[in-house]
Amino acid sequence: MSEKKINLLDLDRKAMRALFADMGEKPFRADQLMKWLYHFGVSDFEEMTNINKVLRQKLAARCEIVAPEISSFQKSTDGTIKFAINVGQGQEVETVYIPEDDRATLCVSSQVGCALECTFCSTGQQGFNRNLTVSEIVGQIWRVSHFLGFAKDTGERPITNVVMMGMGEPLLNLANVIPAMDIMLDDFGFSLSKRRVTLSTSGVVPALDKLGDAIDVALAVSIHAPNDELRDILVPINKKYQLDEFLAGIRRYIAKSNANRGRVTVEYVMLDHINDSTDQAHELAKLMKDTPCKINLIPFNPYPGSPYGRSSNSRIDRFSKVLMEYGFTVIVRKTRGDDIDAACGQLAGDIRDRTKRLAKKRMQENQISVTMN
């Protein structure tokens, strides 16, 4: 049986150089190859003209360049594009491109599904399947860059920012997320600024400490409630890592980080008459007073079967004003792509359909059982 080929999109620069050393090649050859991959989007070794023919043949015999494919895409009226990315085994994840006047952000998934079961999030309600590999994470950027056109073709960078805010909890997939972000930041990779790569977490505190020791990127933290009692319901991982512990971990990360410029972004979804009262705004302000942050209020994006409603503009405005009275910088996130279910909390991919099929199957089995009894 032939040996499985190495997918070069799985390798950060350290691993790529180790592979080339194993082949008896100098480190700069690995750097050249990475540049072909990520600056020019080349996947055919024969097109890598500054790499000699013998090495190209060695690479072709031992390695491959395989990224997940785009299955389909939908374009919103506001220009947002939601991509369904086929990661094999009949599974898909969703990746969202958000163009703005001064930037173009790609929202990337880290897992097929999510295990955290946040009650306001469509992805969290669909269950967890598996972690994505490095090539499946960076491959989302690579494929969308091909779709939009690399800088060599268009004259401008197609993606300026990456946010790890798609499907999944990134800190539960650190083994693949860290090398993937290394490739995003690497000068021979996607060459993004560390301030333009953001990881969002719901609070896996031990993994947050490991992240801070391994890499420096911007951090967004999903708080969503001003106290443990409510957060236990909205974000069930809070039962394991409560707010005091999470906030202490955030402060440790800030102390290690330059990317965050001394503060993180707090994400707070606005749920009608659940977490959006002025009393809760005062409570949130007091909770966050010792943690340097700006606060991003996110109008809830309903999904089929969701138990919550979106806060009214007037309630969001009152909540925001209370926080500003305490001196916080407050941003109300503009909802993008909600007409194609691409907004925050709406991503579910193929898992939604699979969950529906499983639920239908269980219901049918129960009906059969009742009939037999």
UniProtKB/Swiss-Prot annotation:
Uppermost EC category: transferase
Annotated catalytic residues: E94 (proton acceptor), C344 (s-methylcysteine intermediate)
Keyword match S-adenosyl-L-methionine: yes
Protein name as it appears in the record: Dual-specificity RNA methyltransferase RlmN
Family recorded in the similarity comment: Belongs to the radical SAM superfamily. RlmN family.
Residues annotated to bind [4Fe-4S] cluster: C114, C118, C121
Cofactor comment text: Binds 1 [4Fe-4S] cluster. The cluster is coordinated with 3 cysteines and an exchangeable S-adenosyl-L-methionine.
Lineage: Bacteria, Pseudomonadati, Pseudomonadota, Gammaproteobacteria, Alteromonadales
Gene encoding the protein: rlmN
Role this protein plays: Specifically methylates position 2 of adenine 2503 in 23S rRNA and position 2 of adenine 37 in tRNAs. m2A2503 modification seems to play a crucial role in the proofreading step occurring at the peptidyl transferase center and thus would serve to optimize ribosomal fidelity.
Listed GO CC annotations: cytoplasm
Keywords assigned by UniProt, alphabetized: 4Fe-4S, Cytoplasm, Disulfide bond, Iron, Iron-sulfur, Metal-binding, Methyltransferase, rRNA processing, S-adenosyl-L-methionine, Transferase, tRNA processing
UniProt domain Radical SAM core: residue ranges: 100-339
InterPro entries, A to Z: Aldolase_TIM, Methyltransferase_A, RlmN_N, RNA_MTrfase_RlmN, rRNA_lsu_MTrfase_RlmN/Cfr, rSAM
Organism: Shewanella baltica (strain OS155 / ATCC BAA-1091)
Source species, domain of life: Bacteria
